[in-house]
Every structure is written in C-alpha cells, then in structure tokens.
Amino acid sequence: MGILNVTPDSFADGGRYNSFNKAVHHAREMISEGVDIIDIGGESTRPGAERVSEDEELDRVIPVIEELADEGVRISIDTMRASTARAAIGAGAHIINDVSGGLADPKMLTTAAELNSPYIAMHWRGQSKDMNSLAIYNDVVLDVISHLKERISAALEAGIKHENLIIDPGIGFAKDAHHNWEIIDHIEEFVALGFPVLIGASRKRFLGGDTPDGREAASVALTKRLSTTGIWGVRVHSVKPHKDVFAK
C-alpha cells in the first residue's frame, strides 16, 4: 500500500504532493513501481495535528481519486469521516482506511457496511492532537488486541462483512517506541485474530534516524521482517524497495 498524502503537514512528506499535479504524478510513479493499493489522504494524522474541515478534505482528495480511478490500481481513502468515505467510493475508491476504527464518526461503520467496501479499522485512542498523552498501557499487546476485538464486534454488528474487515494495530498512534516494538514482536497474535492485518510503520520515529527520509532503510528492513509473519500488507512511502523485499 503506497501512501499519497495530499496534505501540507503530514510528518514524512507533508507539502510534497499537496497539489493535484504533484499528487497524480507521484501516484503514477508508484503504479509504475508495482503498487497494489494507493492510500490517499487529505488530513494529516501525525501527532499534534489539528482536524481540517470536511470541504477542505474533499477538495484535496476527490479530484485525485477521480483522475486515478481508471489507472487499474485499487485506491483506499484515508479518512475518519463517513461523508468523505462515501464521496471517495463514489469517485472511484475501493477501500476505506479509518484510523479511528469508527470512533471519530458514529456514521462510519454503517456507511462502510452500506457501501460494501473493504474497511480498515485501526487501534485509536483519540484525536492526533492528544495522542502523545494517551500512550499508557498495562500490557500494550493485550490492551490493543482487546480494543481491536471491540472494534471488530462493532463493525460486524453494523453490517460490515467479515471478509471486508481489515485490522491495524496502529503503530505510532498513542504508542511510544517500546509499545511499537512490543506489537511488532507479537504481530502473530494479531494475525491470529482471523482478519487481514495492515502495518503502517514507514519512516516513523521509533525506527531511529534524524529525519523521516533517514528512516527508509530501517523501514525496508522492518518490511522484510514482517513479510514472513502472515500480515496482509504494509503501508509505505516508497514502493519499489518494499516490493523488492517481498519478491525475494
């Protein structure tokens, strides 16, 4: 899953692709490198980020989705809003990637069920501006699994089909470096829940390095490690190095 942030303030690439032409060009580069899914987001979820308006989010993502809809690659919409998810699916997206797991918008789960779209539910403890203060756990693996089980139940009760549900333990969201590594060390326990597992760890601070770009080698090494664990996918900034790992 290749990341396409059409935002000015995402942690790793904010501002690089926040115009229509730059976003579409980068998406086509990822397609040429063999990306399976392009995850398009118009609202940063980095720690400390403020929400943007619905209109701003739609203005950022819908034209890009419409342009890429016929490129032969699956598109996911990275959003916490049911209205944005509905508009994106209508514009040609295929998957809803909701970092809040349906908690930010009470209409999201029923909307995903109605649209019959694959839905990614992530472990989430609150808005981005508050997440650093929420990284407190008794046992991070057990706590995150317990939370995901609750979101799985809520999603299924809302009408989302079992085969449409994907889970994400939320690496870097209300978690410190130790928490992130604990989850990675026990990722098979998440796979054992019986749903596809997505991991989004690309270029995040816990990997070390002074800058996001400086964490790329560590990101690829982590993908190599995860490639044998049975996870469904990795969400990454650079497609080719990660594809090469899976090809070996």
What are these regions (language model features)?
Residues 1, 35, 74, 94, ...:
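Hydrophobic "anchor" residues on beta-strands that sit immediately upstream
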Residues 1-2, 29-40:
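N-terminal glycine-rich anion-binding loops that anchor highly charged ligand groups
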Residues 32, 73, 151-164:
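Phosphate/pyrophosphate-binding loops at sites that engage ATP/ADP/AMP, CoA/4′-phosphopantetheine
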Residues 12-21, 25-26, 45-67, 71-74, ...:
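Active-site-adjacent loop and "lid" segments of alpha/beta metabolic enzymes
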Residues 39-41, 74-75:
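Short, conserved structural micro-motifs that define repeat-unit consensus positions
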Residues 5-9:
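Short polar catalytic/cofactor-binding loops
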